[in-house]
């Protein structure tokens, strides 16, 4: 009896310690059970890949967050070791086989395709079409936007692009002969941001190009967000905590965040105005008026979307995603292209020679995009830049909710995220000779069907990038103007290929993080 009483007394004495240790023991046991399940009993347990990647998402987080976006290179090493299909985290597969690309990235008529929820959850932009998980819901939101971004529509909006291009060239000429060093990557971010503003909300008070130094905070804000994406995407609760922090405190911690808030508020005001104009029956009286004034959100508000999809909150999320995607992706490709052209005298001179005649009357007359896309060397330069520096190098996982996917002898279970990287497609040495070299002439020589098959800078399928035509038009107009006879004479300043090449592959690729940027002077 005394022994039992002693045991009870001991338990009572250590009650507090047990209450503290108990949850910890439970958490550890649960974690171990989860790891054992993932490695040996999960539906993906049969697929090859390192056990640590199968066990925990922390392996990916370590490579991307602490390794500066290096998980893509680790995935490449996995493929070299384990083969064309590998398990890269507890729930996801990666395939490195060009033949499978058109099987995975398909249109809605072939198969319904869902997105990976962590994309939208991590950035808290589930209201935008690009972050919408369900195939049918995504299609509902995307369909009204497609006409605005079609090639014909971009041609009608071309006057706005040309005006911004003229402003860009005029601003660069202000530096002519001064010896002042200019950040060209800031310039391109400003240009891309202004294009999105003009086409989306047309706010006259917002102009990055007219900012005294092209508003470097705009560039830095997006780069900071991109570097945080591995954390947000793997731990979606982080962004929800950030949302709880008062705006005033956030702006004290990082004053640059005010620009993102300002963009959202301008978008909200424009969307409210567009909805009020619709309610009052105020529409564009003719095609010319529509061509000059209609914005993306005018277009969406007047579409046949159900009212539930036209909430100000949802459309404001759409505006933020369009601004982010439309700024960073296009600007990064222009960064890469400018460096490669300026470093290669023969490429640069051939481009200047081709542009001498068509651009001779700039800025009084600017050739249309339709005219400029017929210039073979200019288009080859752009296409090769998009091959080596696509706006998205992330693996872009797709989910088949209703059908198993078949890859060779492998049966991929339904609802399994499967991704492929454009960079792997573009760097295939069996398709592109000397794949790491910038050689625009490859697109003018013996172009094979495999080269076209592997060329996927904007991905394919029902979730293909909406802004393909806008991106091509913007890059074409900018570089035709910069390297035409009336363009500024740019000269690189302490800048090399590594300052423009994609090196850190977060959701969006960035150059090496210790780069001082793409610096140039403008010669007299």
Swiss-Prot record:
Residue positions with a glycan: 126, 344, 496
Keyword hit for Cell membrane: no
UniProt entry keywords in alphabetical sequence: Glycoprotein, Heme, Iron, Membrane, Metal-binding, Monooxygenase, Oxidoreductase, Transmembrane, Transmembrane helix
Ranges annotated as spanning the membrane: 16-36
Localisation: Membrane
Keyword Glycoprotein among record annotations: yes
InterPro entries (UniProt xref): Cyt_P450 (IPR001128), Cyt_P450_E_grp-IV (IPR002403), Cyt_P450_sf (IPR036396), Cytochrome_P450_monoxygenase (IPR050121)
CDD domains: CYP58-like (cd11062)
Protein role: Cytochrome P450 monooxygenase; part of the 2 gene clusters that mediate the biosynthesis of fusicoccins, diterpene glucosides that display phytohormone-like activity and function as potent activators of plasma membrane H(+)-ATPases in plants by modifying 14-3-3 proteins and cause the plant disease constriction canker.
PANTHER family found in the cross-reference section: CYTOCHROME P450, N-ACETYLTRYPTOPHAN 6-HYDROXYLASE IVOC-RELATED
Name of the protein in its database record: Fusicoccadiene C-8 hydroxylase
């Amino acid at each position: 009896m005394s022994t039992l009483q002693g045991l009870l007394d001991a338990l009572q004495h250590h009650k507090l310690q047990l209450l503290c240790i108990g949850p910890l023991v439970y958490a550890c046991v649960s974690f171990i059970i989860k790891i054992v399940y993932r490695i040996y009993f999960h539906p993906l347990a049969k697929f090859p890949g390192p056990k640590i990647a199968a066990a925990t998402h922390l392996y990916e987080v370590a490579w991307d967050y602490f390794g500066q976006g290096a998980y893509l290179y680790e995935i490449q090493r996995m493929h070299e070791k384990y083969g064309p299909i590998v398990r890269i985290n507890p729930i996801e597969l990666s395939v490195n086989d060009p033949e499978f690309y058109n099987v995975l990235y398909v249109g809605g008529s072939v198969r319904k395709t869902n997105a990976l929820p962590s994309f939208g959850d991590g950035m808290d932009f589930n209201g935008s079409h690009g972050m919408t998980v369900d195939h049918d819901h995504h299609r509902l939101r995307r369909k009204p936007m497609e006409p605005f971004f079609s090639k014909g529509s971009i041609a009608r909006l071309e006057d706005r692009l040309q005006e911004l291009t003229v402003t860009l060239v005029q601003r660069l000429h202000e530096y002519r002969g001064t010896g002042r060093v200019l950040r060209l990557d800031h310039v391109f971010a400003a240009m891309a941001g202004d294009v999105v503003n003009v086409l989306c909300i047309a706010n006259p008070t917002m102009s990055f190009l007219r900012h005294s130094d092209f508003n470097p905070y705009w560039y830095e804000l997006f780069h900071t967000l991109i570097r945080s994406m591995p954390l947000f995407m793997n731990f979606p609760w982080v962004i929800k905590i950030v949302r709880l922090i008062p705006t005033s405190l956030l702006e004290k911690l990082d004053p640059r965040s005010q620009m993102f808030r300002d963009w959202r508020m301008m978008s909200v005001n424009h969307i409210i105005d567009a909805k009020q104009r619709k309610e009052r029956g105020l529409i564009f009286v003719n095609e010319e008026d529509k061509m000059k004034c209609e914005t993306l959100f005018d277009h969406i508000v007047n579409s046949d979307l159900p009212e539930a999809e036209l909430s100000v909150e949802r459309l404001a999320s759409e505006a933020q995603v369009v601004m982010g995607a439309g700024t960073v992706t296009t600007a990064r490709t222009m960064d890469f292209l400018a460096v490669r052209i300026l470093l290669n005298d023969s490429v640069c001179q051939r481009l200047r020679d081709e542009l001498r005649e068509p651009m001779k009357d700039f800025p009084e007359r600017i050739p249309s995009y339709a005219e400029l896309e017929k210039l073979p060397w200019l288009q080859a330069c752009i296409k090769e830049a998009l091959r080596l520096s696509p706006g998205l190098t992330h693996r872009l996982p797709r989910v088949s909710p209703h059908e198993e996917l078949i890859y060779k002898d492998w049966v991929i279970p339904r609802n399994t995220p499967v991704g492929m990287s454009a960079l792997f497609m573009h760097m295939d040495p069996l398709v592109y000779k000397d794949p790491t070299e910038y050689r625009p002439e490859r697109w003018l020589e013996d172009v094979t069907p495999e080269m076209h098959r592997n060329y996927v800078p904007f991905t394919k399928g029902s979730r293909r990038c909406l802004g393909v035509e806008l991106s091509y038009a913007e890059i074409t107009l900018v570089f035709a103007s910069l390297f035409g006879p009336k363009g500024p004479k740019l000269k690189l300043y302490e800048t090399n290929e590594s300052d423009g090449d994609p090196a850190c592959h977060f959701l969006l690729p960035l150059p090496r993080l210790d780069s001082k940027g793409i610096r140039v002077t403008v010669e007299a």
